[in-house]
């Protein structure tokens, strides 16, 4: 999408009249940033995260991360958007952001899987990824299945961490199945442990196909 209202309008003109729909399920605010977790009908059914940056009460910058909506729930019967939505524990925002930041850096970026269990309350972990079941056992089974198929996933850099209360969003860059990828992970924290997770995974287009030069990150 190109910059400005002109770029936004050009995309809208490509949509069939009246076809665009959005149902926002979660919203959180962190300073000048607002994050929305939504279900879309936008060139087909999708699940997405939008990040907006505000100045003087106006939206001045936007990032989005979209994934095709699955036709079936995940192995534990969960969708990509159901589950807890209420923001609570506002006084714990800072400590929850630090917990999740440590988890992503230690486990996802640096691959220290022996540290994994310390961030969770046993197997009490609700998973909304469309291919993974609940619990650390579900995550382990999914990673094993990926390895057997030769599918690799690598987080290489964290670009932004935003949070409010019990919710923390991590925006990262890496590779999935050999393709450059943006990872958008939303975690819910309860009593110092990660207890629920939602995400989108989106392949980053080659730069020659970009409609602007801002990139997927640029925070």
Walk through the language-model features, giving the residues of each.
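C-terminal and inter-domain tail/linker signature
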Residues: 1-219
């Amino acid at each position: 999408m190109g910059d400005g209202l002109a770029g936004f309008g050009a995309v809208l003109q490509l949509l069939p009249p009246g076809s665009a729909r959005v149902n926002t399920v979660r919203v959180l605010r962190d300073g000048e940033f607002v994050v929305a977790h939504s279900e879309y009908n936008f060139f087909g059914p999708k699940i997405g995260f939008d990040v907006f940056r505000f100045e003087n009460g106006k939206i001045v910058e936007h990032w989005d991360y979209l994934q095709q909506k699955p036709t079936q729930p995940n192995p534990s019967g969960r969708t990509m958007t159901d589950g807890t939505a209420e923001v609570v524990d506002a006084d714990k925002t800072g400590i929850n952001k630090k917990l999740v930041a440590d988890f992503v850096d230690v486990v996802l970026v640096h691959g220290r899987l022996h540290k994994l269990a310390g961030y969770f309350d046993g197997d009490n972990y609700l998973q909304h990824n469309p291919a993974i079941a609940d619990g650390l056992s579900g995550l382990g089974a999914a990673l094993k299945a990926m390895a057997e198929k030769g599918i690799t996933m690598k987080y290489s850099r964290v670009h932004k961490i935003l949070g409010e209360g019990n919710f923390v969003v991590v925006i990262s860059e890496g590779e999935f199945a050999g393709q450059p990828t943006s990872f958008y992970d939303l975690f819910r924290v309860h009593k110092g442990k990660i207890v629920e997770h939602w995400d989108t995974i989106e392949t980053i287009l080659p730069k020659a196909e970009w409609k602007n030069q801002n990139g997927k990150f640029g925070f």
